[in-house]
Amino acid sequence: MALASIFAEFKGLAAGVSLDNINPLYVAGGILGAFTVYSIILVVYRLRFHPLTGFPGPKLLAATTWYEAYVDLIHHDFPERLAKIHEKYGRDFLTIKLIVVPRSPRFSGPIVRVSPHEIHVNDAEFFHTVFATEAKHRTNIIPPRGLGQEDSIGSTRSHDMHQLRRKPLDKFMGQRNIVRQQSMIHEEIRVLDQAMTSLKGNGKPVRLDCVFTSFTGDIVGRLACGEAPQLLQGKDFTPEWYDMIRGAARIIPVLRHFPQVGEITQKMPNWLVQALVPRSAGFRVLQMLGAERIARVRAEVADEKKGVEGGESMFHYLLRSDLPESEKISARLNAEATSFMGAGTYPTAATLIFVAYYILADPKIEARLKNDLKDVMANFDDEVPNWEKVEQVEYLQACIKEGLRLLRLFRRKARIATDIDLTYGGYVIPKGTPVSLSPYTMHMDPDVFPEPTKFKPERWLVEDLDPRMNRNLNPFLAGSRNCIGMHVAWAQMYLILATLFRPNKNYSLKLGECDESDVYPVVDNEFGVAKYDSRGLNALVV
């Protein structure tokens, strides 16, 4: 009876409540007050009671991610600021912990708390502890949201699910299979070389950035779906593709901190996305391209059961695999297509843009490269040499390594050890904590790379090569989640540069109206991007 009377009394009170008696200002004030109290409690917890409280670093970063969002969206230079944070808090770390650590004048201070939930370590020797193979420990990630790629291999949070999704493609994207399939790269090389020959002497600058982006887009299209979109054969090498990919990259900092923008735009019709958020339209185009080709491949695989010979592509492999049927639905494969087309196109093209600029800008580098390519490219008119032969040209290898180093994979990359605590310098990092390292700081460490901002291929050719150089160079990351497309990226870079800069061809390239600022990466959009008003890489074919 007591309980019934309480309910009756409550019902009577509720009946007396009228919306007319509610003051909107009081409601707004109550909500604001509750949010303020919650925020204060959250900050106090993060600064005083969080498991990462004892790690060095700025209190502002430990309290909130809003500062990083501000820097990413306004100044685009958080990696440089992170380097300064290491320099400042490293002195305290070394003094308090009494640990002797090799220090560089710029990147000192090996461990800092870089967000409320994340630890950043600036020590290349710790790289393979964090980016571990499955034999060492399992690794999760914090997946990006808002890109429409949440179900792709690269964005899969769980270690076990990542391995399940990746296993069918490890063989397809492995070095042996790329070597076996490199005839498709040779075919595109012929298209590229013939196009350059046809442009000789017309006096019109060629956008090499568009050339490289279209080349890599065609190769990725063939690998993914067995069919090239023929971007390289489009008018002026399809500059719309380059503009779309670069435009999509510009929205990444927004989606990094406000993924809801991407999630909302994915539900909008195409015309509305183009009108309201034009930079995100690039992701929509990638999704549409992927959806159309997946439907075609799905039909081909179905026909194989009727005795019709099918093609060979990433999606043929996935649809033929023993993956659960839930992993073969179009929505997930479309996420894979979007991720593969984006990640497989621009980073490789950006490296080619960067390396080609420095070769064209320095006659000594170009002359030496041509001389060293003389033998391996001698029979190019009859046969495009294999990637394995071209990569033996040490100076070309040095140019590509230097380009990958300077391209500056800006964004720090984090891994989460799910099963074990990690120990570094007297600190125990609890399992489940995101721990990140920055290829940027490893690639730009002046102790390892003197004059780190300069393009110096010869640094890789000295007899007493510092072993730390190869240790620090990690453009494709490492461990069980390393870049699945790195072998095709290497093959394209070697063969394209060898073709364009081989001696005794019937055309030459001359740098057009552009300078270093048009190619040098200064914006942190996951990978380094040149200034937004860049003129691109222009060259005359003479």
Swiss-Prot record:
Glycosylation sites: 506
Topology class, membrane: Multi-pass membrane protein
UniProt main location, coarse: membrane
Any single Pfam family the record assigns to this protein: p450
UniProt-listed InterPro entries: Cyt_P450, Cyt_P450_E_grp-IV, Cyt_P450_sf, Cytochrome_P450_monoxygenase
GO BP, sorted A to Z: antibiotic biosynthetic process
GO cellular component: membrane
EC number, UniProt record: 1.-.-.-
Top-rank taxon: Eukaryota
Cofactor(s) it depends on: heme
Segments passing through the bilayer: 25-45, 340-360
CDD domains: CYP58-like
Region annotation Disordered: where it falls in the sequence: 141-160
Binding locations of heme: 483
Function: Cytochrome P450 monooxygenase; part of the gene cluster that mediates the biosynthesis of sordarin and hypoxysordarin, glycoside antibiotics with a unique tetracyclic diterpene aglycone structure. First, the geranylgeranyl diphosphate synthase sdnC constructs GGDP from farnesyl diphosphate and isopentenyl diphosphate. The diterpene cyclase sdnA then catalyzes the cyclization of GGDP to afford cycloaraneosene.
Protein name: Cytochrome P450 monooxygenase sdnH
Originating organism: Sordaria araneosa
